[in-house]
């Protein structure tokens, strides 16, 4: 043991704490020079934290029908330990030189501010809510699977800081005695504002948007109720829109696409956004040098649903068709994969719902 007292301080040695950590000497060296921070872990391998989070709100009734409010709130996700903590990257070149899987992904914290309005207008026929918000995230936790460069196991790390800001609006309108309209819309702007040094050239650059955060999404619904044959009948229809977004915080899409081509002889067919710069240190098979720092694009999607129903006494029945146009609406899931995999919306689905109340 090159570091006297380490075995005693950490209850039998670093090897017992960092299973799968590779070279014991390398792990000890990383602890000594500060690349692996174990200050939050006690001799039993337990991480404990104490803190206070705040939530405060203030509202003001402008009239009987309109209220405005403000909210300040804080949140957090607790720290998490990595089972392959202390493992040096298998690739010790370029941006990976000296990289070590962290012992702990630190607690990430959130500060949120909201200003909004809740209202009932048009003699109670219209309910309208609007809220604007801004959120700051410090030490954002992310998971990563990078077997080509770091380790075969998924691990957690703190990528840096981020900001989000947006506006949400929802409404319900009694357009007539029979017709009800409802809907919601959300505008979202996100940005990665700081990147930890060890992730430069691995994560997407500062200024990039956060993954799976479409700038615009919304829905609108209509329902028409009427009496028929001694019971209650209705028609309903809905449209749901989800704007385009990107997947993942690591800029590994071009690298994964190259792996896809070598493994299966074909591309995934999913669009890629170049975020600027290059990713990693392994050149692509096309002979064009390092792959670009890039992410997969999840295209926007619009789905439509319709239904017709009837209820009488204790029985109700509804015939429905969801996703009429069989919109694919795929979302790429890059985490924990060598090649891109996608989840998709359920295709056009028709069915009959029956219920009985007693």
Residue ranges and their predicted role:
Residues 1-63, 100:
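Signature of Gram-negative outer-membrane beta-barrel scaffolds
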Residues 72-78, 87, 121, 132-138, ...:
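Transmembrane beta-strands of outer-membrane beta-barrel pores
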Residues 50, 58-61, 74, 107, ...:
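Residue-level signature of outer-membrane beta-barrel architecture
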Residues 52-58, 101, 111-115, 165-169, ...:
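Hydrophobic, lipid-facing positions within transmembrane beta-strands of outer-membrane proteins
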Residues 239-265, 279-280, 309-358:
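C-terminal beta-signal and adjacent terminal beta-strands/loops
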Residues 61-77, 83-85, 95, 104-167, ...:
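Membrane-embedded beta-barrel scaffold of Gram-negative outer-membrane proteins
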Residues 127, 132-136, 155-251, 353-357:
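Gram-negative outer-membrane beta-barrel transporters
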Residues 44-52, 106-109, 159-165, 210-216, ...:
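Short sequence motifs at beta-strands and strand-loop junctions characteristic
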